Swiss-Prot record:
Pathway: Amino-acid biosynthesis; L-lysine biosynthesis via DAP pathway; (S)-tetrahydrodipicolinate from L-aspartate: step 4/4. It is an enzyme of class 1 (oxidoreductase). Gene3D superfamilies: Dihydrodipicolinate Reductase, domain 2, NAD(P)-binding Rossmann-like Domain. Keywords: Amino-acid biosynthesis, Cytoplasm, Diaminopimelate biosynthesis, Lysine biosynthesis, NAD, NADP, Oxidoreductase. This is 4-hydroxy-tetrahydrodipicolinate reductase.
Length: 266
């Protein structure tokens, strides 16, 4: 396979660290630069626990793009920074794979239009774990037969957004096969505000944040005399790397924006 030159934004994070290791062990990936506002001017090898790579680190993406030629930006930063990075990448005609979440419908619409106008491949993935993508697809299928559903997503206590992008995407897919329906008693009253979680067309989403967790989600469907639970667990961040690899390889052949890995797997 032809070499793919990659820039990683956010190499110090746990996902970023796994992505650097992925670059090192994948023959056709070439990590040409990284972006980290705290370590501009250093090298990947200068960061604790990193492999001995001479890859330069830039303090900001704009400067990096002025000095480095790349094929793909892999962004694993925070929601706000990720939004800035993907906007800049699309405007510059650089393909990007975005692992941050928190995009609004309007932001996604604008990015989709710009990516189409520039004919630049972009993938925004709420979850890179193939198992999580299958969980979402299975939940979408089940929604045809079970109209009563609630979502419980559980993540580590350092996660910045709630609900998770995976939960939001799951509900979006379920809604495609389910008419709006209020789940629970029509006259129910929350004795404590928020006790029933977020409500999207009658689908309740509950967010749990605790140390010891990584990324987990249960989609619970209820019916007369039965329940169906679809669950996925990521026990470490290595579980996301197969999806990262697939996304980087796939985005090279795209000329538009794709939201969600379920749209690129068979």
């Amino acid at each position: 396979m032809k070499e793919i030159k990659v820039i990683i934004a956010g190499p110090r994070g746990r996902m970023g660290h796994e992505a650097v290791l992925l670059m090192e062990r994948t023959e056709h990936f070439n990590l040409v630069a990284a972006v980290d506002y705290k370590h501009g001017g250093e090298k990947i090898s200068d960061l604790p626990g990193m492999p001995a790579l001479d890859t330069p680190i830039y303090a900001d993406l704009h400067t990096c793009l002025e000095e480095v030629e790349a094929d793909v930006l892999l962004d694993l930063t925070t929601p706000e920074v990720g939004k800035q990075h993907v906007t800049l990448a699309v405007e510059r005609g650089l393909r990007s794979v975005i692992g941050t979440t928190g995009f609004t419908e309007e932001e996604l619409k604008q990015l989709t239009e710009t990516a189409k106008e520039k004919a630049v491949g972009t993938i925004i993935a709420p979850n890179f774990a193939i198992g999580a993508v299958l969980m979402m697809k299975f939940s979408q299928m089940a929604a045809k037969y079970f109209q009563d559903v609630e979502v419980i997503e559980l993540h580590h206590d350092q996660k910045l957004d709630a609900p998770s992008g995976t939960a939001v995407k799951t509900v979006e897919l379920i809604r495609q096969n389910r008419e709006s329906k209020q789940q629970g008693h029509p006259n129910e009253v929350e004795q404590l505000k928020g006790a029933r979680g977020a409500n999207v067309d009658g689908i309740h989403i509950h967010s749990v944040r605790l140390p010891g967790l990584i990324a987990h989600q249960e989609v619970m469907f209820g019916g007369d005399g039965q329940m169906l639970t679809v669950r996925h667990d990521s026990f470490n961040r290595a579980s996301f790397m197969s999806g990262v690899k697939l996304s980087i390889e796939t985005v090279m052949n795209l000329d538009h924006l794709v939201y969600g890995l379920e749209n690129i797997i068979d």
